Amino acid sequence: MKKILFVEDESALQKTFGDILKQEGYEMLSALDGETGLTMAKTENPDLILLDLVLPKKHGFEVLQALKEDASTKDIPIIVLTNLEGTGDVEKALELGATTYLIKASYTLEEVVAKIKKALPD
């Protein structure tokens, strides 16, 4: 079973994604802030990370950069979630090494699953 780490401070969104991922046959790990997410990425060795950008304790960009600079986590695919379309955040996330992104206000559940399946190595 593939393991997905979801770093997101909104617990309602954590639950929604958890339900979806479970139905799709994935195991979901949760972190409610950037610092915890970074620690869990290193200790839990997830197959993929869903990363919100606006997080308490450590911003998503800091987490993303730290993950990509660490030999133990640099190859983990990362899907960034943001509300901040049109602010340059998507471009910055991709430059820092994100695999792809989702705009929170406009994604569909099918899109989430499709992006996860595409980003996950077989």
Predicted regions and their residues:
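Conserved acidic carboxylate
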Residues: 8
